[in-house]
């Protein structure tokens, strides 16, 4: 295990998140921790970064901060007062730390912001001085369905934004990861591959290449349930609490092998950019 992603909900709502991170450091071979956050708790996030980098001098930390729009619109959509301001405060706190701490703003392109993406990008990079920024495209999930008339506009905005991020990265106006580290280089390359694959299948969903859910990556829920990914909710691999917290026992099990076989044979596919 080289990397662990701590996600939510909001991971920093868990007051014991520092202890959770330490358990991964002490009991696995991780080299990096990647945290996705809405940045509503700047002080708690900064404290986490300080404590963990002091606890282990080799761990790289990346904080993905979600910002989707201008301040007023972002706060309204997320239904949290001053959330945008907290995002910027969090970003700046983390940016002032050592080079093993990398904050990166992540924009999800949706039907609500796609028409204004160029202005949002300009505002974030020029007015807010954000110099690490990535993006994902909204995915239909549960009851949420992207309005059909907006899908092409979302796609065009996503293509423009990913191209702009790559352009700015080449001229060093954006620095999304610590490229001195192996994990930073892997994360950076993974983003580029993910963007290219997503562009090929967003408007016309189709199988392109084998999915490695259940082998290269998997997820653990807050209840200790292990799945190959967040999409295949009917493919429970096991419960850590019923297996003496032994992840590898579940990972090497017959159930997991059957799930991987299903993924391979069914040509399971999606635009799961979070992995």
Where are the model-predicted features located?
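Short, flexible loop/turn elements at secondary-structure junctions
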Residues: 10, 37-41, 67-69, 107-109, ...
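N-terminal pre-core extensions flanking Radical SAM catalytic domains
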Residues: 1, 190-191, 247
């Amino acid at each position: 295990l080289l990397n662990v992603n701590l996600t939510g909900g909001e991971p920093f709502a868990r007051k014991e998140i520092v202890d959770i991170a330490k358990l991964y450091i002490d009991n696995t071979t991780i080299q990096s921790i990647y945290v996705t956050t809405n940045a509503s708790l700047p002080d708690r996030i900064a404290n986490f970064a300080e404590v963990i980098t002091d606890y282990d001098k080799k761990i790289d930390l990346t904080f993905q901060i979600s910002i989707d729009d201008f301040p007023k619109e972002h706060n309204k959509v997320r239904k949290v007062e001053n959330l945008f301001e907290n995002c910027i405060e969090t970003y700046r706190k983390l940016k002032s730390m050592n080079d093993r701490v990398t904050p990166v703003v992540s924009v999800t392109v949706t039907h609500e912001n796609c028409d204004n993406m160029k202005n949002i990008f300009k505002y974030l990079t020029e007015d807010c001085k954000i110099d690490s920024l990535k993006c994902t495209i909204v995915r239909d999930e549960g009851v949420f369905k992207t309005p059909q008339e907006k899908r092409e506009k979302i796609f065009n905005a996503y293509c423009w934004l990913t191209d702009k991020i790559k352009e700015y990265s080449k001229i060093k106006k954006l620095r999304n990861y610590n490229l001195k580290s192996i994990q930073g280089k892997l994360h950076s390359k993974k983003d580029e591959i993910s963007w290219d694959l997503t562009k090929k299948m967003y408007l016309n969903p189709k199988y392109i290449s084998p999915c490695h859910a259940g082998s290269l990556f998997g997820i653990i829920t807050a209840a200790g349930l292990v799945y190959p990914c967040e999409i295949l909710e009917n493919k429970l691999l096991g419960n850590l609490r019923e297996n003496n917290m032994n992840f590898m026992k579940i990972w090497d099990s017959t159930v997991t092998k059957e799930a991987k076989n299903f993924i391979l044979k069914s040509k399971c596919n999606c635009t799961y950019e979070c992995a």
